Amino acid sequence: MSLSPKQVQLFEQASKHIPGGVNSPVRAFNGVGGTPVFIKKAQGAYLWDEDDKRYVDYVGSWGPMILGHAHPDIIQAVQTAAVDGLSFGAPTVHETTLADIICDIMPSIEMVRMTNSGTEATMTAIRLARGYTGRDKIVKFEGCYHGHSDSLLVKAGSGLLTLGEGEPTSKGVPVDFAKHTLTLPYNNIEALKECFAKFGHEIAGVIVEPVAGNMNLVTPIDGFLQAIRDVCDEYGSVFIIDEVMTGFRVALGGAQSVYQVKPDLTTLGKIIGAGLPVGAFGGKREIMECIAPLGGVYQAGTLSGNPLAMRAGITMFKHLREPDFYSKLEAKLQKLLTGLQAAANEAGIAFKTQQVGGMFGLYFTDQEDITSFDSMLACDTDAFKKFFHGMLERGVNLAPSAFEAGFISSAHSDEDIELTIQAAKETFAEMK
């Protein structure tokens, strides 16, 4: 999409003092090409850019805007909280209330600690697993993103022969950190078992996205998550489910309720604060009691449990716990994806969609199943780039990467869905 001179000027100005002109790399449009659009405001299912062009939004600030942008109840909660003070650096009753809600909704969480971000949550969960077990090694899976802490910015070599000799995927991460992270193919149960047969008594924990939302959207095959549960039980390792993206998005009880698996620890993201900066990790009481001040595993944060995020989150959960909230959300998304698939079929374009709750994936491929990072890499990313820009031109905002999931909110209307399907029909016609 060609941008106005104003938008180009804004990006040039931003690039003078902000590296790459953005404060998070995916916003730079490197995955789709072109210059990022600067957003001025948001309301409900819509964004408006600095030229006052409106977009139907399927990014939702990368997931947390499940009620839509600027929901009046959330805005009221934040405004009321702000009048009482922005941050105290002391306990508040609102932290306890939100913790009670989370523990009530997710039975695997017996105790929970608030953090400032999902990265802080996963970083501390890894530290906690190591402190609890007295071991160093962590298992993660290809294509799963768990924040930008050093221990998790790692990619191991292919095959079991190179396990334990991982290399960082970011400069600035010491190789000594990488050697403790073992990376396995997602959905590969045999590789998991072989890894534990070789290193099991050295493995502190396994961390996994139950639905991988950072390689588009890849769901777990039957038995995969349970296999992780089983080997962790067998070897005394900590099973960590990263629900930063899926928590309260795919179902009220998160992906762990959808796939009926119980982790030892769970990490959560900014959805618990209705989109404000916040995260959390929680799980078994005996493990959580290893965290300071009760135990020797240190974690702290001046803004952890900040009152604005706590009160926004408490208000949001009142809506999420309403009867049929998630069934209505899923029905909306199913209608959208059915329409997109029909439009692609009519245009003769190899295209596939996938849905879990309110999350979705779009793939330009004729593959029957997308079950791994390799199968995702085999999709046509050039076709996605064309589709992205065609949709953006027509007022539909998708994630600017073929490797990111999309999200729908309760604010999306039938008219928004019809507009999106029509935009796709026109874009597919251009792509023939």
Curated annotation (Swiss-Prot):
It is found in: Cytoplasm. Its EC number is 5.4.3.8. Its main location: cytoplasm. InterPro entries: 4pyrrol_synth_GluAld_NH2Trfase, Aminotrans_3, Aminotrans_3_PPA_site, PyrdxlP-dep_Trfase, PyrdxlP-dep_Trfase_major, PyrdxlP-dep_Trfase_small. Pfam families: Aminotran_3. Its cofactor is pyridoxal 5'-phosphate. GO terms for biological process: protoporphyrinogen IX biosynthetic process. The keyword Isomerase applies. SUPFAM superfamilies: PLP-dependent transferases. One of its GO terms (cellular component) is cytoplasm. The modification N6-(pyridoxal phosphate)lysine is found at residue 270. Homodimer. NCBIfam families: hemL, PRK00062.1. This is Glutamate-1-semialdehyde 2,1-aminomutase. The gene is hemL.
